[in-house]
């Protein structure tokens, strides 16, 4: 995941004071743990500091100063001074998220106040110019300068609310029989491997009620303060500010139209998965005409269904494309996994990670303090310091995540030469799509065979269906999930749902769109289940993950065409293709200097998001699902339970 002021990484160390720490890494990784987290923390930091994301099409007042030379001098000074402030803020935030102490939180609060004050002044100065006759870049950069902040007391309150939500999420443990479990790694492993419905329900309920109930009162304050801040800057509400990242007023209808085109594939996948869960858990748990129980669909949140692979594999007697056993047998280490990710990018002629990367990143979970484990990439805004924070384990899932996060960092390194206002992806979905693009190529059988993680085998349509099923569990299944996470929040920000009905409204929308229901009643007014996922409590929009899933297939199609791939898209690997790397670098180096359709056109020749590459990629699986579901007489869709 990308965070737009800095990125974040997995295992870092920092003492209770101000020193930066990293993770415990093997000697060959040369890490003493003194590093920042690179989750593309721009988003988190922007949230804390009321600095707009670089993509925002903020409404600004028209001034009277028509001197473009003076405007350019102002922008040059702003670029230098604000980059330095952002770097300082990134360091403070890194230290806090890799060591969740009150001391480190106080430092973030102090730096945030200075950044907010600078942003207010810079915004006022930028607004003094009449840009009507200015050149394109001067005009566009001025619209990205600073933003208006809440008053100091409210800004302090917002910063504290965000820190408290982060700390609750990062520190929460669930306990049973005097033993306590963290989300990473214990609960995550349980949800990935357990087929005990009772055990899974316990973990799901304890996590959602423990985190959701603690964060709920803070989230009410958060919605109020973020809305107030957004309106100060000319937006209708905070959801409007998020959507303007795409520089269009039509995003809501656009994403709904895109999903309608993919929905038939999703419903086929849903029906098939429901049948396999029925065979695993029985009729007392699974209704063959109803929604899926939330605690049984993959991870803690039902976001990724990848961990259902063994249950739903179409041809269980044929190989699955999960080389985790091979990685373990070959004594893979965290360091080796990151080295291979870096080498993948270099093979395309792209930039290697900086020499400081392994020293400064947190790549494994430390044992001596509480940290935020969610994998993130960080850009420290100095053009040199890029890091990852990740509590990595030796698994294929984490191997793919590494390539995803390194994709974020590659994007940041490619646009590091641009003025600060342009140092961002063309839109939020672009950044995420680039990360997934790398993981897509790495997951192919061709690539895994080339790096010795999969035995060479003859083409087998049944193995292909197994592969496509696994891919669908981590892409197609996420589309309605990510859509609902934000359509629900957009309604919150617009004030369309009474506060005491937030949770019920979420589950009604989720049941209707995703076909997933809570496993136990969720009508307690204390509950707020959506905030129990990192992105919601961490102030990240999630429509970026919806748009990225659409765009990653468009980008993959373009790169595969450029690299002269012959055959279906799902067999394409652009490893070692410098032609693909050159084309990709051209788009990445644009940053947000142009509207996103321009960036997309530079790589794909298209100016709109299209689901056709995704549908073409999964066409063999879609056809197989239609036949299999018809054979079993499956109901496509689901009945909403009366209690819903």
Predicted segments — roles?
Residues 1-44:
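Classical eukaryotic N-terminal signal peptides for Sec-dependent ER targeting/secretion
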Residues 45-48, 55-221, 239, 248, ...:
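N-terminal helix-rich structural modules
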Residues 62-71, 102-103, 137, 237, ...:
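C-terminal, non-catalytic "cap/extension" segments appended to globular domains
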Residues 179-193, 199-202, 220-389, 456-477, ...:
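Active-site-proximal, well-structured secondary-structure segments within enzyme catalytic domains
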Residues 240-245, 249-253, 272, 276, ...:
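Inter-helical turn/loop segments and adjacent helix faces that build the functional surface
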Residues 392:
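Ligand-binding pocket scaffold of soluble enzyme catalytic domains
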Residues 412-437:
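Post-HEXXH active-site segment of zinc metalloproteases
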Residues 432-458, 468-469:
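Conserved catalytic alpha/beta cores of large enzymes that bind or transform nucleotide phosphates
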